[in-house]
Amino acid sequence: MNIDLMKLTVDYGILGILIFMGFVSLFFYIERLFFYKNLDEQSYSKKDLLEIELTNNTSIIASIASNSVYIGLLGTVMGILITFYEMGQTGQIDVKIIMTSLAFALKATALGLVVAIPAMMFYNHLVRKIEVKLALWQIHNS
């Protein structure tokens, strides 16, 4: 087992993916806000077409919100695996080393939560805006 490769995977792979997911969710949230601000819902003759336009890219934000926690958990599990492997290889149980390694392993879960919580807030905010836009269209077209 190549421990150095696993450490790099956790540090750059898992954490890099989580940071990227955070930027993607923020980008699509801002993009949707600009789209909703400039949208004239009355220019749509069919409600389904309006709904398709309104919900575009929201599933990406929802997927990021739900999956970033699991990606963070994967990083933590890999970090704990590395800690136990290194303990087994050295044959020594040093509490300082174990606690430091476990603390670094938990950073992946923490980052996963840091990405997931705002993404879920973004998604819920957009869903509310979608409901309002659809209701306004319904009021004007019924």
Regions flagged by a language model, labelled:
Residues 1-134:
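Hydrophobic alpha-helical transmembrane segments of small proteolipidic membrane proteins, enriched
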Residues 132-142:
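ABC transporter TMD-NBD coupling linker
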